[in-house]
A protein has these predicted regions:
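Structured loops at beta-to-helix junctions and adjacent beta-edge loops in soluble globular domains
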Residues: 70, 79, 167, 214-216
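Conserved acidic-Pro-Pro-aromatic motif
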Residues: 134-141, 181-186, 192-239
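Conserved SAM/SAH-binding loop
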Residues: 165-173, 190-192
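S-adenosyl-L-methionine
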Residues: 1-142, 147-152, 161, 174-181, ...
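Conserved protein kinase catalytic core
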Residues: 121, 146, 172, 195-197, ...
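Short, surface-exposed basic-aromatic patches at helix termini and helix-loop junctions that form
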Residues: 128-131, 154-157, 202-206
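Structural motif corresponding to alpha-helix initiation and N-cap regions
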Residues: 97-100, 169-170, 195
Length: 239
């Protein structure tokens, strides 16, 4: 049986939405409502599709720029490397807001932002636009993301204040002037590679830095052991 075929004549189908001259967004909504009602096993996927659709609509309505929050005015080109579902919360200034607020509340002497896993520059550029940071250093593995990041930096008028580097390895700190690490904050988000990237040597070199690490221990079978090892490595220099 076709999954969109009604079980009885009284049941609405996604196609009915088209007959009522509904908007594209409304048609998508009706379709997903039908899926959730008749195929609950598909619900997680349907919710994610709807979330992405709404997010894209919010992003387009605000001219593809952040409209609220500390990064207000941040413009990002099409081709974002983040998921579609993140665009809306970025636009509303809610994307990882607790992390943003925490970074902005750091002592004012910290004016250098370093990011490993910079993607398109939401943090690296946004923090410069906030007026809180003077410069950013962004490590990004993907060549396409680095190109988009460079374009976004020019788009927002901060290209002269941002340094874009390639993939960070365990000795990434050697690419930075030690003087640049004295009044800096480091954000690491590399989808599970943090356990291979950060060790005793890097924590020692970054002893004067505030460090934020997005942990992905759950992606590794031995995630708990990796997490414990990371804690031991940083215990001498960071709390």
């Amino acid at each position: 049986m076709d999954p969109f075929q009604p079980k009885d004549k009284g049941q609405r189908t996604p196609g009915d939405a088209l007959d009522n001259n509904l908007s594209y967004a409304q048609t998508i909504g009706r379709t997903l409502e039908w899926i959730c009602r008749n195929h609950p096993e598909w619900t997680p996927a349907a919710v994610e599709v709807r979330r992405a659709e709404l997010s894209r609509w919010v992003w387009q309505q605000h001219g593809q720029q952040v409209a609220h929050g500390p990064f207000k005015g941040l413009r990002l080109m099409d081709g974002l490397q983040w998921g579609e579902a993140d665009k809306g919360v970025m636009c509303l200034g809610l994307y990882e807001r607790e992390v943003v607020d925490d970074i902005l509340a750091l002592p004012t002497r910290i004016t250098h932002f370093i990011e490993i896993g910079a993607a398109d520059g939401y943090y690296g550029i946004g923090l410069l636009l906030s007026g809180r940071f003077q410069r950013s250093t962004c490590f990004e593995t993907e060549a396409q993301s680095r190109q988009i990041l460079a374009h976004n930096a020019r788009l927002n008028g901060v290209a002269a204040r941002i340094r874009i580097l390639g993939e960070a390895g365990p000795s990434f700190h050697e690419e930075l002037d030690p003087r640049d690490l004295r009044d800096a904050v480091l954000l690491v988000d590399v989808e599970g590679r943090e356990f291979d990237l950060l060790g005793e040597a890097s924590f020692l070199a970054l002893s004067d830095c505030v460090i934020y690490i997005e942990l992905h221990d759950w992606v590794h079978p031995d995630g708990m052991q990796r997490l414990e090892r990371l804690r031991r490595c940083c215990s001498a220099t960071h709390t």
